[in-house]
């Protein structure tokens, strides 16, 4: 892969939408090949985007943490919540067992049950050996009812299956795609966003990837790379006049995946660091927001026995990082989360939907000019 291809993947999505780095927004750390959660080996992501007429602005995002072929192999997992006005199915089992298996789906609030059923349907088709065994997959949601007729139940089980079947590796589209189609972030069009960081330990390079469904924050709160923007971009904020929800309401789901070998409690520690990355974008965490996070390690394949199918071995065995080596992975989560939110915003474009509700896209030219002026000012101070 050439340097030009690498730079293109960091600057634009496959659909040609700009990413935050294309606007001159600076970030710390070293991103992976695609600067996406798919930089973690084996991770596959797919979208089912539903835009029909004036009422449907929604969809499903499907994530295979260990590829389709590893869907039944439990991963070390940890769950954390910043604010609990939301739903992530399977979270109680993650907390109890320290593991999860099967794909993950992200969608809208009133379709979370459909997405859960869709994951089970997908697994039953591809893994008939599951038989009558129980499944507790992870399906999570954010509310898209401003742009989408959320009570019309546009999302079906087949949409979820289609998202999982469409999943692949490589660079990812961002913004109004998949479960992020109708989502709003800081009063601008938000949605799906992703980023990654490389972390070296004991001579091995590991990857931490984050995927967010960004649907949170009031306009006045917005910060990018330490630059407050809410005060300079206050105009054209139709959501501020929407009385059905208080400012800052919405929700954000974050999925953190890494190929570093971790214990379940270490995964929980990574999930908690998502909060710090979100805070860098300005939010204080609204009481009306559902901010739920899942972190998993794709290392140690076969390390956990499937529940009820232990087989001949009397013990499970895992390799894991010592706790005193984990801080760089915390930093990677924080940096990737911040950039994933910024990427969701930068890919967003104006959308009109249900009841004529309209949300503007981030004014990218103005944001780019602000960061260009900041960079030029910094250079002058050094001269």
Task: Indicate residue ranges for each PLM-predicted region.
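Alpha/propeptide regions of enzymes that mature by internal proteolysis
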Residues: 2-383
């Amino acid at each position: 892969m050439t340097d030009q291809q690498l730079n293109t993947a960091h600057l634009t999505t496959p659909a040609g939408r700009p990413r935050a780095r294309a606007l001159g927004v600076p970030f710390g750390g070293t991103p992976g090949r695609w600067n996406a959660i798919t930089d973690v080996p084996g991770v596959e992501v797919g979208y089912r985007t539903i835009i029909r007429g004036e009422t449907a602005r929604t969809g499903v995002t499907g994530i295979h943490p260990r590829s389709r072929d590893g869907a039944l192999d439990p991963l070390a997992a940890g769950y954390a919540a910043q604010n609990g006005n939301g739903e992530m199915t399977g979270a109680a089992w993650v907390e109890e067992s320290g593991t999860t298996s099967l794909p993950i789906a992200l969608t809208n609030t009133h379709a979370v049950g459909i997405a859960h059923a869709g994951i089970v349907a997908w697994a039953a088709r591809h893994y008939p050996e599951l038989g009558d065994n129980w499944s507790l997959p992870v399906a999570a949601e954010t509310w898209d009812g401003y742009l989408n007729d959320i009570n019309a139940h546009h999302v079906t089980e087949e949409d979820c299956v289609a998202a999982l079947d469409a999943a692949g590796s490589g660079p990812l589209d961002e913004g109004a795609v998949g479960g992020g189609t109708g989502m709003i972030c800081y009063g601008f069009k938000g949605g799906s966003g992703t980023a990654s960081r490389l972390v070296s330990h004991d001579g091995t390079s590991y990857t931490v990837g984050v995927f967010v469904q960004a649907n949170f924050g009031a306009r006045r709160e917005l910060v990018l790379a330490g630059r407050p923007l809410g005060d300079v971009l206050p105009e054209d904020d139709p959501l501020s006049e929407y009385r059905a929800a208080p400012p800052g309401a919405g929700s954000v789901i974050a999925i953190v995946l890494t190929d570093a070998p971790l214990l379940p409690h270490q995964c929980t520690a990574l999930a908690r660091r998502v909060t710090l990355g979100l805070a860098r974008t300005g939010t204080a965490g609204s009481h009306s927001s559902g901010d739920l996070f899942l972190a998993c390690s794709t290392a140690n394949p076969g390390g956990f026995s499937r529940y009820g199918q232990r087989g001949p071995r009397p013990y499970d065995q895992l390799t894991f990082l010592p706790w005193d080596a984990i801080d760089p992975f915390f930093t990677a989560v924080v940096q990737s989360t911040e950039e994933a939110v910024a990427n969701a915003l930068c890919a967003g474009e104006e959308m009109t939907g249900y009841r004529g509700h309209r949300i503007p896209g981030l004014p990218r030219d103005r944001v780019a000019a602000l960061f260009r002026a900041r960079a030029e000012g910094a250079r002058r101070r050094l001269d």
